[in-house]
Amino acid sequence: MKGGMAGLMKQAQQMQEKMAKMQEELANAEVTGKAGGDMVTVVMTGRHDIKRVSIDPSLLEGVSEDDREVLEDLFAAAVNDAVRKIESNSQEKMSGMTAGMQLPPGMKLPF
């Protein structure tokens, strides 16, 4: 019985390590979303960070290249700000439910 418990603990530890590695891989993955026939493109990480926004110049006729780039950066910053606020709100609301639970570092609820 003692050996079985040790084996079970070892399996649990290995599973936790694999989960942490998978969470890191998912967090670092990048996906691209497109709209309007590829006229607007957004690149986002698994951490929900907007890395890049591209707006086709034809959508912003009369706007300089520099102003278009500023608009793209501001859009990315605004979305990132909204995502952080949602995450903070979710974490705050869930903290009451998870009080006393021992979750691995970095693990967020809901899963």
UniProtKB/Swiss-Prot annotation:
Metal-binding among keywords: no
Protein localization: Cytoplasm, Nucleoid
Xref: Gene3D superfamilies: Nucleoid-associated protein YbaB-like domain
GO cellular component, one term: bacterial nucleoid
SUPFAM superfamilies in UniProt: YbaB-like (SSF82607)
Keyword Nucleotidyltransferase assigned: no
Keywords of the record: Cytoplasm, DNA-binding
Gene Ontology molecular function terms on file: DNA binding
InterPro entries in alphabetical order: YbaB-like_sf, YbaB/EbfC
Chain spans, region Disordered: 1-20, 88-111
UniProt cross-references to PANTHER family, sorted A to Z: NUCLEOID-ASSOCIATED PROTEIN YBAB
Family membership noted in the UniProt record: Belongs to the YbaB/EbfC family.
Subunit structure: Homodimer.
Physiological role: Binds to DNA and alters its conformation. May be involved in regulation of gene expression, nucleoid organization and DNA protection.
Protein name: Nucleoid-associated protein PFL_1905
Source organism per UniProt: Pseudomonas fluorescens (strain ATCC BAA-477 / NRRL B-23932 / Pf-5)
Species classification: Bacteria, Pseudomonadati, Pseudomonadota, Gammaproteobacteria, Pseudomonadales
